[in-house]
Amino acid sequence: MTATIDHHDLAATEPLLLPERPARIGPTSRRLLARLVVGLAVWFAVGSVLIAVGSTAWRAFGTSMIFPGAGFLYVAWPVLTLVTLVAVVIALVLWWGVSAHFAIPLVWLASAAGAALLADGPRLVVDRGTTWGWVVPLAYAGAVATLGWMVWRIESAYRRKAAKVPELNEYLRSATLPAPITSRRAPDEMDAELLRWCYDFAFQPEDGLDGLDWGEQFHGGTQLRYQMNSLTWAMSLYAANHLPNAPGHITRALETMVRKHTDLRVWKYWHALNLIGNFDPNPDPIRRDNIMFSAFLGDVINCVEAATGTEVFDQPGSLEFVWSDGRTFSYDHHTLTEAVRRNFERSSLGFFPCEPGWSFTVCNVMGAQALYGHDVVHGTDTWEQVRERWQHTLDHEYLTPDGSYAHIRSNHIGVSWDTGEVPGGHYFANGTHRFADILPAHARRAKALELRGAAPKMGALSSMVHDGRLDLDLPPELERHRTRTSKLLPWVKIIGGARLVGDERLVDAAIRSSAEKCATGERWPNRPLDASASGLGSYMIVRWSAPLDLAGLAMRGFVDPVGPVLADTAWDDVLVTEAVSPDGDSLRLALQPRIDDAAVRITLWFGQLRPGVAYTLAGTGEAHSFVAGDDGAAAVELTVDRTLVLVLAEAVAP
């Protein structure tokens, strides 16, 4: 495995400004939207002809073509008009929720056919065959009003944002970004509890997913895939930042976490989406679309490999997805990455879908990260193969005038709308790396724009820190799936915001206070903090994001540990919470019994020592001396009955 760093764009010093004359819509989206407009124009024209020259039945049909359900009102069935409007709303939800792209046209066509069939039939409260001619101009008025309202909303949002461009560019020219926080915080008891929970979750039977939240798998916060993603990312950060010199146990845990992503319960949702949205019965979760699974898993594996150096998932067939009828779809890190690259190339929009027909910015950022991270750890160039087109799509199809990006866009008709998943349907950056690896200049611009709102808020919170604590009683907030509230979620935002502005004092205070105020005292399968599984994963990510955050880990790739390492011990009996070499010569080690109030006699096997050199292992009432063997290895026996903080160093000559 190789580790490389792409320095492309890293040296740029000029700020990335916003376009002074931004387009209202990108070229590909414009073409898709024009196709929709032509189709609607033909549809309305046919409806108008039927109204003008047709029989009563055809007039009813044509009236519904002008406005869904209006034909029912024309034939004096107002109740069915209301039913149609409700059906249109349901179809709209299904269009977005399960990619039922046919739902709205089907309801529209059904309302027209139904009105025609009832044209000469009985009525509820009026005479048989009654028609209300005034409905025809009302249908046209309704169509014009609806289309006009849509255009007005889009145009007013565009003009409002475009008016900000001169001010924003002036700000960007002089904006300064705070240095990232890179100092490592020593793990405390809550870190130990969180790590213990992660191990307990990972090492349950491989078909076990106890500890996750269960619910629908299409949208919301109960998707198993995203819960697994966040937990694995967090564990990767812990491995890289706190256990680089004791990789054995956490590497096995992370390998198990990746394998759990192949559990059928995690990805079986795709069969229904692919069938409904693509009319494709193939359940393979990697082959086509579904970037919300393939790209996220690719990025997860990147992080695991960068943190631990494992090459397990580079082996052919190391990722096996077994469908309910026994069909097996075999992949590995390389073929998974190739599938993501291939999907980018086949997409006419440049971004490819999560749910069929819907391409989300965040998911496609994750797709770019999946390619970039693979390139770093394997020395390939998959990201550079798609980078230019990908960036063009980002800048010309998704960018809005104020520097934010549309959350979602249709691959079929080019429209973007607010799904309610993110505030306002836009954001300055997204993905776990927020452009830092794939497009550093974009990352700097996004961070500068985010700081305009975040810096004053974080400054006010920072002034409230006393004695290393932030004494706030924050109200619980709804989790993303809206089935429960969490006291931890507001703290995640504060810690993330404090990292954004580079306020280490506020970060430490929020980490300390959040643990004190949100602790439950419970262990797996319950959670040690008041949060959902996704919320817990997000919290661990922001808690463990120094000195390396996820972007830094991706850009660094895997680096062999320097200095002494803890090669092996009784991992089931002892919890190692820290193993780092601050100077390349010594080893700082923290460990405690896996079981509370237990005293365990263990052996610590050390490696990468200097052959024949005398060492001491001391701290927390312990003192051991030994000489490293010719192979640079040594073993020490000791009793662990409490938290021990030890330092292994070369013995000082008397």
Briefly describe each language-model feature range.
Residues 5-208, 303, 307-311, 425-614, ...:
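Terminal, non-catalytic domain-edge segments
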Residues 176-279, 499, 503-506:
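Long, contiguous N-terminal structural blocks used for assembly/anchoring
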Residues 191-199, 232, 247-265, 294-305, ...:
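Hydrophobic core segments within long, regular secondary-structure runs in both alpha-
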Residues 292, 321, 327-331, 335, ...:
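Extended ligand-binding clefts on enzyme/binding-domain cores
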Residues 199-219, 259-284, 337-358, 395-418, ...:
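Glycine- and aromatic-rich loop/turn segments at beta-sheet edges
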Residues 618-636:
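Solvent-exposed beta-strand/loop surfaces of large extracellular or lumenal domains
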